[in-house]
Amino acid sequence: MYAIIQTGGKQYKVAEGDKIFVEKLNAEPGSIVTINEVLAVVKDGSIKAGNPYVEGAKVNLKVVRHGKGRKIIVFKYKPKKNYRRKYGHRQPFTEVIVEKIEA
């Protein structure tokens, strides 16, 4: 059994026990987060597709930790004008484990 969920503007294919990295969630590590935005559920070969979401379906995620991704360097440069700008960005994420899929 697996489900396709939407969180943080992205879609993820998840099964029970999966560990995934999602966009940062406002939840403490160790807490349970319920995702109601379930786009599809596949169980024993039968597919339930939502329009846009499957009614009554939800996925429980356990928050493991928060962190930051690897650093991305952005460098702007204009030749002959002595214009240089360098800055970095680290995208925050939340690591979660899929506890239960209810459909």
Swiss-Prot record:
InterPro entries in alphabetical order: bL21-like, bL21-like_sf, Ribosomal_bL21, Ribosomal_bL21_CS
Disulfide bridge partners, by residue number: none
GO terms classed as biological process: translation
Pfam families associated with the record: Ribosomal_L21p
Any one GO MF annotation of this record: rRNA binding
Superkingdom field: Bacteria
Alphabetized UniProt keyword annotations: Ribonucleoprotein, Ribosomal protein, RNA-binding, rRNA-binding
Entry annotated with the keyword Membrane: no
Gene Ontology cellular-component terms listed: cytoplasm; ribonucleoprotein complex; ribosome
Keyword RNA-binding carried by entry: yes
Subunit architecture: Part of the 50S ribosomal subunit. Contacts protein L20.
Family the UniProt entry places it in: Belongs to the bacterial ribosomal protein bL21 family.
Its job: This protein binds to 23S rRNA in the presence of protein L20.
The protein, known as: Large ribosomal subunit protein bL21
UniProt gene name: rplU
